[in-house]
Amino acid sequence: MPPKEAQASQKLFGTDGVRGKANVYPMTAEVAMQLGRALAFLIRNGPHRHRVIVGKDTRLSGYMLEQALASGLTSMGVDVELVGPLPTPGISNITTSMRADAGAVISASHNPYEDNGIKFFWRDGFKLPDETEGKIEELVSSGSIDSIRPTATKIGRAFRMEDARGRYIVFLKATFPRELTLEGMTIVVDCANGAAYKTAPAVLEELGAKVIALGVSPDGKNINHKCGALYPENLAKTVVKHGAHLGIALDGDADRLIVVDEKGKVVDGDAIMAICTGELVARKQLKKKMLVSTVMSNIGLERAVARWGVKVARTRVGDRYVVDEMRRNGYNLGGEQSGHLIFLDHTTTGDGTLAALQLLAVMCRAGKPLSELASIFEPVPQTLVNVVVKQKKELGELPTVMKVIKSVEQRLGNTGRVLVRFSGTEPKARVLIEGEDAARNQAYAKEIADALSKALSV
């Protein structure tokens, strides 16, 4: 663990909780315990016993962090319900249904097994706002609650919840229209050897589908390894080989969804949003004729939904910011190109399995193959390049990079756009070029990526 002065200058929370290499600061047992104590301090009010739901994905380091987080919570007099491996949205759902004070997820989502993370949900099932995360960070760094030590009967207890998985499966099935069935459909589902390895196949089978399951043999080290939402190639091959109706790809914590049509073509979050927007408009269920996406979404999404008189509100990257925009303005559909899809009429956060069920409902009602439904979305060519960096700075502090960006913007004119941003969860900068000429996009992206590499290599 770095010295206290280094820790003080290092922000714990990113765009999706605290994340890093397992057993390396800040993803250590010590920090996990401190996070638990800080969360417990914030929720302690009134004479009643307080409870926090704690779940995880299938990473090896989850055992270590689960115990440390639970120790921190119980040491402050808060009870803990340990649900074991369960999708992130499942933990959010259990938190609200159990009327718990908060929920905690131990996961690094789509990252490799060497990483891990901790993120929190409030009692209403929504992720903590930035201000609350800031309070937790201040409590951890200041040491101001170190002396608070409940004793004897005031110490919290930890329990194992044995039926959490079943509760979540029942919830998911209830979001699928009762009059519909998946009988006669063959569905390939890739669970990324992650948190949904038992829930997603079960839901689809119980609704009547013939299921071919991939990525359902987690060993603690193979989560997201050449499988799941980031690696749909094997899924696509399996769909075509078995003549399946579609393929469903989830990531390690199952909060995102990418699908593959019956021809093996990938259908991303933008296309899924376009399809579901059309369905909600037709059923007069899309609130205020608005869809929420992020700056990463393709301009083709706006063009696709414009035919129904729907407008798109864009936010910064991160499903939490999509949800914030939806709640603030009373919208009920939003998501990200990466596959975080939020159906606010059903849930409070991105849920890959739930989103798949909503898409399947559209397919059942339309009686059309996914490839035909997805044809309403025509993306403008995009190039996305990830640049590994050793440090992150404001782009305005990088004159050589800004010069290249402005040059590219001038050459693109009004025929495309440039987006350069730092990842909130990884040591990477992301360069997105959108324009009608794919080859030109690649060349422009490389120019900017090279400039970033030179400027941030030390």
UniProtKB/Swiss-Prot annotation:
Query: What biological-process GO terms show up in the record?
Result: carbohydrate metabolic process; peptidoglycan biosynthetic process; UDP-N-acetylglucosamine biosynthetic process
Any idea what this protein is called? Phosphoglucosamine mutase
Gene name, per UniProt, is: glmM
| Cross-referenced SUPFAM superfamilies | Phosphoglucomutase, C-terminal domain (SSF55957), Phosphoglucomutase, first 3 domains (SSF53738)
Posttranslational mods? Activated by phosphorylation.
Q: Which residues bind Mg(2+)?
A: 109, 251, 253, 255
The similarity comment for this entry is: Belongs to the phosphohexose mutase family.
What top-level branch of life does the organism fall under? Bacteria
Write down how the cofactor binds this protein.
Binds 1 Mg(2+) ion per subunit.
Please give the function described in this protein's UniProt entry: Catalyzes the conversion of glucosamine-6-phosphate to glucosamine-1-phosphate.
Reaction equation(s) it catalyzes: alpha-D-glucosamine 1-phosphate = D-glucosamine 6-phosphate
Species in which this protein is naturally found? Myxococcus xanthus (strain DK1622)
Please provide the record's keywords in A-Z order.
Answer: Isomerase, Magnesium, Metal-binding, Phosphoprotein
Give the first-level EC class, as a single word. Answer: isomerase
- What Gene3D superfamilies has UniProt attached to this entry? Alpha-D-Glucose-1,6-Bisphosphate, subunit A, domain 3, Alpha-D-phosphohexomutase, C-terminal domain
Does the record bear Isomerase in its keywords? yes
Cross-referenced InterPro entries: A-D-PHexomutase_a/b/a-I, A-D-PHexomutase_a/b/a-I/II/III, A-D-PHexomutase_a/b/a-II, A-D-PHexomutase_a/b/a-III, A-D-PHexomutase_C, A-D-PHexomutase_C_sf, Alpha-D-phosphohexomutase_SF, GlmM_bact
